[in-house]
Amino acid sequence: DSTRVYVCGMSMGGYGTMDVAGKYPDRITAAVAICGGGNSSYARNLSTLPLWIQHGNKDRAVPSSESTKIYNAIKKEDPTADVTLTIIKGGTHGSVERLFHQRKMYDWMFSYQKK
């Protein structure tokens, strides 16, 4: 179903999520990037699709500033972009893996469908 193509990933997969969504925003319905970051050159493209960025503030493998940086770049391109940044207080790189087991993330993603 080409109207329901979602991408999500954590750590290097979070970077990959931003990369795929940034390169092919016309093919992606919504994306979730956890503990990753992104290339600000994709900010314009990323601003065109629903994106939820999540990161723990105690992550020592990938600093949460990586997520904040791409979030700010997207909002600079389009202040009305449907992008959310959630910084998880006390979250470490491994502890936020639990997000993949929470229905809230999937309910959010699956609420979107391309027209």
Region locations from a protein language model:
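Surface-exposed acidic, glycine-flexible loop patches that form ligand/cofactor-binding
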Residues: 1, 39-45, 77, 114-115
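Short, proline-enriched alpha-helix->beta-strand connector loops that line the catalytic pocket
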Residues: 46-51
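Solvent-exposed loop/turn segments at secondary-structure junctions
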Residues: 11-15, 36-40, 57-61, 90-95
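Gly/Ser-rich "nucleophile elbow"/oxyanion-hole loop immediately N-terminal to the catalytic nucleophile
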Residues: 1-12, 23-27
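Hydrolases whose catalytic domains are alpha/beta-hydrolase-1, hotdog thioesterase
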Residues: 16-20
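C-terminal catalytic histidine-bearing segment of alpha/beta-hydrolase fold enzymes
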Residues: 54, 60, 64-115
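A conserved short beta-strand
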Residues: 26-37
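Short beta-strand immediately N-terminal to the catalytic nucleophile in serine-hydrolase-like folds
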Residues: 7-9, 34, 54
